[in-house]
Amino acid sequence: MVEIGKYNTLKIVKDLDFGVYLDGGDDLEILLPARYVPRNVKPGDEVEVFIYHDNEGRIIATTAKPLAIVGEFQWMECKSVNDMGAFLEWGLMKDLLVPFREQKMPMREGKWYLVYVHLDHVTKRIVASARVDKFLDNVPPVYEFNQEVDLLVADETEIGYKVIINNLHWGLIYHNEIYRRLERGEHLKGYIKEVREDEKIDVSLTRLGYEKVEGIAGIILDALKVQNGFLPVHDKSPAEEIYSLFGCSKKSFKQA
């Protein structure tokens, strides 16, 4: 049985001029149009495809990669609005519908929105919802200290950045622990710093532990880790630039 809205590895059963048919199980054959068929494949080979409904409501396959699959959050741009709802650009030929009931506020063409991709419980079609809170923090946050997690940057607040952890929970990265600007929609790795008594979760972009270097040297080392080993400053950089990044004097920077 195929999973709608997710990646499936399926076997080719027919090769025709307009594409190939894939074995979807239960006597279901799914078309992979010719434009998406990998080179040199033949009946019996397996291909990884994304499964969704086309504009006619038929189950269809593609090797194109959507911005998000069912069960994931992402920032997406609104391409159009009609009497059905708003339609988002998500990397496929068919745009992604956000029904009016799933909009926090009326969506406007050209604006970007944080949405959750899911299957409509009535139509079983893939849709998106901007009412993301109802899809988060629904299970206890069972994380260990320093556990590596996947993060999606949701938005910036006065004290830091709100992030979505493993497509399950809200988390927060504090401004004083970040050494570059984060962008909405950015995916990155993080580490669980603390799950508080109220189940709010603090996250760090660097691994924590007793081996952590203290002082200015530790701050610089953390920044290097976040920036993949490169910083746009050195001992000849202006003192103002060094202070803006690390909150220390040029002399302290050199000593570190």
Regions found by a protein language model. Give the residues of each.
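Single-stranded RNA-binding regions, centering on S1/OB-family and related RNA-binding modules
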Residues: M1-A256
